[in-house]
UniProtKB/Swiss-Prot annotation:
It comes from Helicobacter pylori (strain G27). The RuvA-RuvB-RuvC complex processes Holliday junction (HJ) DNA during genetic recombination and DNA repair, while the RuvA-RuvB complex plays an important role in the rescue of blocked DNA replication forks via replication fork reversal (RFR). RuvA specifically binds to HJ cruciform DNA, conferring on it an open structure. The RuvB hexamer acts as an ATP-dependent pump, pulling dsDNA into and through the RuvAB complex. RuvB forms 2 homohexamers on either side of HJ DNA bound by 1 or 2 RuvA tetramers; 4 subunits per hexamer contact DNA at a time. Its EC number is 3.6.4.-. CDD domains: AAA (cd00009). It comes from the Bacteria. Homohexamer. Forms an RuvA(8)-RuvB(12)-Holliday junction (HJ) complex. HJ DNA is sandwiched between 2 RuvA tetramers; dsDNA enters through RuvA and exits via RuvB. An RuvB hexamer assembles on each DNA strand where it exits the tetramer. Each RuvB hexamer is contacted by two RuvA subunits (via domain III) on 2 adjacent RuvB subunits; this complex drives branch migration. In the full resolvosome a probable DNA-RuvA(4)-RuvB(12)-RuvC(2) complex forms which resolves the HJ. Residues 183-253 are annotated as: Small ATPAse domain (RuvB-S). This is Holliday junction branch migration complex subunit RuvB. Belongs to the RuvB family. Mg(2+) binds at T67. It is found in: Cytoplasm. One of its GO terms (molecular function) is ATP binding. Pfam families: AAA_lid_4, RuvB_C, RuvB_N. Keywords: ATP-binding, Cytoplasm, DNA damage, DNA recombination, DNA repair, DNA-binding, Hydrolase, Nucleotide-binding.
Length: 336
């Protein structure tokens, strides 16, 4: 599958740009109001007790602000944050090196935490529960366990697949938050704030149009904003008006619902099955894509907006999908 403009993952060239547009304070962070409210209370209480925060887990589709909100937590707690990802922690020694370099109340953010190996999880358990690192030296009867005390710290785990977390690991998080898709009005506000940082004038209706096509995801909204800005520059326009915005979005292949070719191909596959469940492996083979990408990158938004149902036997298109694609459903055959 070719690179999608609505890809939920951060593209290589976007890393530094994302940081520059990242909110630094609660008042700058738009959306996720319930999560923000709970976190503000927890942070205030922890600071009054002069303790570290409880370990917390953020889960949900990519691009909804798990990393951004973790940076704000660190800023509010007036402490440092160490960012890593589970695939980078291959050996227990890798984790030990990270943990022993943490200071009191520091935050360790582990992205894709569901990908930690069982051996790494075993090292992490006493660190989370007792702030203790158990290191085994040697093997067999001569093996010895050395216990190293760690300063109190907060582990923030982020995952797109909460169901793949082991129960022992999940149970060790004191707080767990499901990140929700954003409303068009929230995304429009994010877009307008980002446009100010980019020194780009944008019409209200242009921000609304980009927001409508951003699949409820700030990362996609900001990406589309920057691509539309490119079109405006080429057209020698200092203002992103509705005409330029519509032209750019249509050229980028993102329709008014935020769907691209991959989404429409996926939905067509289900709709043409005429109510019969389609297995994930069949979908992956037909689209020439791996199952994980389909589950993480295509299905969440479609599922949240009622375009498919997941059953034990496979995926089924809903009447909403048939109406969108103008593919009629076959009427059930009866004897009368």
């Amino acid at each position: 599958m070719k690179e999608r403009i609505v890809n939920l993952e951060t593209l290589d060239f976007e890393t530094s740009q994302e940081v520059s547009l990242r909110p630094n304070l609660w008042e700058d962070f738009i959306g996720q109001e319930k999560i923000k409210s709970n976190l503000q209370i927890s942070i205030c209480a922890a600071k009054k007790r002069q303790e570290s925060l409880d370990h917390m887990l953020f889960f949900g589709p990519p691009g909804l602000g798990k990393t951004s909100i973790s940076h704000i937590i660190a800023k509010e707690m007036e402490t440092n944050i160490k960012i890593t990802a589970a695939p980078m922690i291959e050996k227990s020694g890798d984790l030990a090196a990270i943990l022993t370099n943490l200071q009191a109340k520091d935050i360790l953010f582990i992205d894709e935490i569901h990908r930690l190996s069982p051996a790494i999880e075993e090292v992490l358990y006493p660190a989370m529960e007792d702030f203790r690192l158990d290191i085994i030296i040697g093997s067999g009867p001569a093996a010895q366990t050395i216990k190293i005390d760690l300063p109190p710290f907060t582990l923030i785990g982020a995952t797109t697949r909460a169901g793949m977390l082991s129960n022992p690991l999940r149970d060790r998080f004191g707080m767990s938050f499901r990140m929700q898709f954003y409303s068009p009005s929230e995304l429009a506000l994010i877009i307008k704030k980002a446009a100010v940082k980019l020194n780009q004038d944008i019409k209200e209706e242009s921000a609304d149009e980009i927001a409508k096509r951003s699949r409820g995801t700030p990362r996609i909204a900001l990406r589309l904003l920057k691509r539309v800005r490119d079109f405006a520059l080429v057209k020698n326009s200092s203002l992103m008006d509705l005409n330029i915005t519509l032209h750019a979005l249509n050229e980028l292949g993102v329709n008014e619902l935020g769907f691209d070719e991959a989404d429409l191909a996926y939905l067509s596959l289900l709709a043409n099955a005429q109510g019969k469940p389609v297995g994930l492996n069949t979908i992956a083979a037909s689209m020439r894509e791996d199952e994980g990408t389909i589950e993480d990158m295509i299905e969440p938004f479609l599922l949240a907006n009622g375009y498919l149902e997941r059953t034990a036997k496979g995926r089924i298109a809903t009447p909403k999908t048939h109406a969108l694609l103008k593919i009629p459903t076959l009427k059930s055959q009866t004897l009368f």
